[in-house]
From Swiss-Prot:
Pfam families: Adeno_PX. It comes from Human adenovirus F serotype 40. InterPro entries: Adenovirus_late_L2_mu_core. Residues 1-26, 41-70 form a propeptide. GO terms for molecular function: DNA binding. The keyword DNA-binding applies. The record marks G26, S27, G40, F41 as: Cleavage. The role of the precursor might be to condense the viral prochromatin for encapsidation by virtue of the two basic domains. Keywords: DNA-binding, Late protein, Virion. This is Late L2 mu core protein. The keyword Disulfide bond does not apply. Its main location: virion.
Amino acid sequence: MALTCRFRIPVPSYRGRSRRRRGMAGSGRRRALRRRIKGGFLPALIPIIAAAIGAIPGVASVALQAARKQ
């Protein structure tokens, strides 16, 4: 049986999670857009390429099963 102890230590700079969600209102939207454009075209493609590489085995197995059934 495991025993877990938890302690609450007050941290002065931490204010907890904010209750309200403002979304991307005002200057935040512009800042996010500028950051996205600043990275360039290639960094935007990297997650898409990684997802495609990860999906190759699944696509190949479906194609093999379809070929075996015919």
